[in-house]
Amino acid sequence: MDYQLRSTGQEGVEVIAQGQIIASLHFFLYYALDNLISQGIEILGRRILLSFQGGSFLEADVQDLQELLVLKLTWHFAKEGNYRLLYTIGYDDHAKENQVFIPALWYKDNEAGEGMFPSFRQSSNWSFLETRMSVPCGIQLSNGQWCLNCCASPAKEKSGLASMTWDRHGTTVCIPGCEWPYSYRGKKELKSMDSQCKPTKHQEANSTYTRSLYILSEKQNDSLKSYEHFLRSMESQFDHPKVRLSWDDYGLYKLTHLLSLIRKDPKGNAYLVMGEGNGEVQEVYEFTAGSFLVKAVEAAYAFARCPFLDNGFKPLIKERERISTLFSLPNDDKLLAKLASLMGRYYLQGEKRPGVFQDCIDLKTGICGGYLGISEHPEFKELVNSRCNGEAMKSYVLLYQALRKQGMIEDAFLELPQRVARFYCDCQLSNGSFGRWWTLGGRPTDTKGTNGAYIGSFFCYLLPLLDSDSVLYADVRSALYRALPFYGNQIEEGQFYGDTLDADSCDKEAAIALLSFFLDAYSLENDERLLDLAIKAARFILTWIWQMNSYLSEDSPLGKYHFCTSGMTSVSIAHHHLDFYGMAIAVDFLRLSQFSHDPYYRRTAYKMMDACRQLIATEEAPLGRGPSFIGWQPEQVNHTTWEYFDRESLMNGHFAIDIAWVNVLGFDAYLTLREQGALPCNE
């Protein structure tokens, strides 16, 4: 990139390219409470020197990697003491007010949904620690014509943790940093920070401190397209997770723990418990469900096509023997397929009337509901949810096919999806939406969000199995074509919110649902317009993928396990923890890479896949639990100052919660990748 550097006043520098100020930076240094006055700035080629009162100075080496500017910032401290380091970044936005986007943290002012999470409604000004973002201090300012993207290298020690704040024309980074006016600590806690003192960083005389700053500033009216360009330009600067478990071992451990969660009902059928061993909050997990948060029908589909895995692995052999004895089944190569059949039969009870399916079951009371877990709205238990129905019915279609390949015909597993399809064909809204929450009589109570995209994916899998001359085939096909413009418009408008059921906010799963739907539709229709929309959904997913290894205390549980945040995904604006959803995203990113001939999505898929092979309980590292939990992998990886249940002791480097969906999603994705030959054989 052809650019020049120009000083502005005593403490600033502008980066100019093609006559445009693409970045404007100012640097400040505080000693104790005093602002050290800048003594002047000198530009020597691609090197910037900024001197401060008292002899300290900042040295910035500037290099460009094509469109990406990289500034290596080194502060030199003349005397011992406590310092605060600040810099600001802006650009010539022609006085236009910018939209602010912070990856995995701030999207469209966080005005979608309800909850305690930070939003413009609560305050117009915020400061966040770098560990809350998928790239440290990552932010984008965009005015409809221009996008300024920037981030920093991660802190290597607690005293260097930075925070970032902004206004509509620029951003300020402070080292060390603090959060204000509130700190979001859990789903129900937004802690006031009024009484805190500004932190400082102690430096010895003649010592140095170095951080890197990354900037991509470009003419672009598409915010997410520009951010993706930023990530691509920085790929060589990013970390890759360290692999600690082979793919063969991953499959063995996942299957072992999944089988340990299987129980038998009084009728002899099988179900999957939601989670175990979760201490003071275990009561929250006394459920089972065919779909969301348990994914039991998807687990059945995985069992139905699982090859005979044991490799002499004693914990798995023990679980197979337990299943064989519990259900009086031969312990042979059909054991898991027969178990899958018993599981499929169990969840058929969720059909309350023809096509009306409520698959969440309270194991203590036996009550069935649309969703019985944690949520902002207890009335969900009385309703029917399109995400739950779409997930479960797609899995029933796949389960039916997988069992049929083994000579096991379970007609009920296809008949139920057909009745549910009829329900949604009849209820589909005039704009093409499949809605979100429905009454048992088919009346919509909530139509917001992306839950209906799961019905779209379900229809894509059901359609090829229907008689092309049948009325249902015609209706499903027609409903599908009416849905595509509606959900395509959600992508175009960036309406990625309201997908997860245990919170109400912008979330990554909204984009995952839309990506899957449009890839499924593209597989049916081979229409490039559908692929273009899938790519746009994928761009939003990229914003939730951690690209660098955030700071973790070496003394924390995550630090002791040498956990890497790179390649992990965070959940939503309302959930500030990391999870292992990346295995499922990887399956779709590999599809997207194949369809679009873009290897970037393939590389990103493998980054997520490798990240998901860590923090799995083994005999040597049981993750704080006993032998019966071999293979468990926590749902909540609390890398920052947040914990689902507001428990301070489990923030900043802790992990918690055994929940079925983590194992189901990971194992099913593992089998899919294995079947596709996408798992490197030497790992």
Question: Predicted segment positions?
Answer:
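Short Pro-Gly-centered flexible turn/kink motifs
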Residues: 199-224
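Carbohydrate-binding/catalytic loop surfaces
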Residues: 267-289, 357-386, 433-454, 494-519, ...
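Active-site lining segments of carbohydrate-active enzymes
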Residues: 370-383, 394-474, 523, 535-545
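Non-catalytic carbohydrate-binding regions of carbohydrate-active enzymes
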Residues: 471, 480-502, 525, 529-655, ...
